[in-house]
Amino acid sequence: MLIGYVRVSTNDQNTDLQRNALVCAGCEQIFEDKLSGTRTDRPGLKRALKRLQKGDTLVVWKLDRLGRSMKHLISLVGELRERGINFRSLTDSIDTSSPMGRFFFHVMGALAEMERELIIERTMAGLAAARNKGRIGGRPPKLTKAEWEQAGRLLAQGIPRKQVALIYDVALSTLYKKHPAKRAHIENDDRIN
């Protein structure tokens, strides 16, 4: 059985073109979502996936109707394949029921994976270059080294941690991370406050 899926985009608010193409392709049932593909919660797609059985084919007008990212598409088509369900995209000439269609889709998947790895590699190289220039990522430290040392001296003088945390406007947990307490000190701090 051929099951169709249509989705509107922000550019094309009418599904008639998609719907007509799916009807001409022989789809017996068509499910529809009237929202952008950026949302992951698509009730029409969920209903279509639930309806599909082994041997059926999910048909879309174009790949981007099914998912915005290649990673999502490959994951979805992989799930379909595991369930014994084929996939067809009319305008992209992809049909996973044939060996050539499966091969073409795998090549697209490999290219998407390579692109993702290249992005990670470039990001890591950029971060390393920034570190070499003395730039550190993340937010600037709340206190200077001297302020942390001063906070440590206050704690050593017996000032309660809560009070020191208030003085320096830091969370109590941050203070514990910078100046770990011995077990006896923790119990004393709890009794004082």
UniProtKB/Swiss-Prot annotation:
Residues annotated to bind DNA: 138-183
Molecular function terms from GO: DNA binding; DNA strand exchange activity; hydrolase activity; ligase activity
Subcellular location, record wording: Host cytoplasm
Keywords: DNA integration, DNA invertase, DNA recombination, DNA-binding, Host cytoplasm, Hydrolase, Late protein, Ligase, Viral receptor tropism switching, Virus entry into host cell
Outcome reported for the amino acid change (mutating residue 9 to A/L/T): Recombination deficient
Gene Ontology biological process: DNA integration; symbiont entry into host cell; viral tropism switching
One Pfam family hit: HTH_7
Domain Resolvase/invertase-type recombinase catalytic: 1-134
Top-level taxon of the source organism: Viruses
Induction pattern: Expressed in the late phase of the viral replicative cycle. Expression of late genes is activated by the viral late transcription activator C.
Note: The orientation of the G segment is defined as G+ and G-. G+ orientation provides S-U fibers whereas G- provides S'-U' fibers. S-U and S'-U' dont have the same host range (e.g. respectively E.coli and C.freundii).
Record-linked PANTHER family: DNA-INVERTASE FROM LAMBDOID PROPHAGE, SERINE RECOMBINASE PINE-RELATED
General function of this protein: Performs inversion of a viral 3 kp segment (G-segment) that encodes two alternate pairs of tail fiber proteins thereby modifying the host specificity of the virus. Binds as a dimer to the viral gix sites which are 34-bp palindromic sequences that flank the invertible G-segment. Catalyzes site-specific recombination in the presence of the host factor Fis. Gin dimers bound to each of the gix sites and host factor Fis bound to the enhancer come together to form the synaptic complex.
Recorded family membership: Belongs to the site-specific recombinase resolvase family.
Assembly: Homodimer. During inversion, two dimers associate to form a homotetramer.
Name of the protein in question: Serine recombinase gin
Source species: Escherichia phage Mu
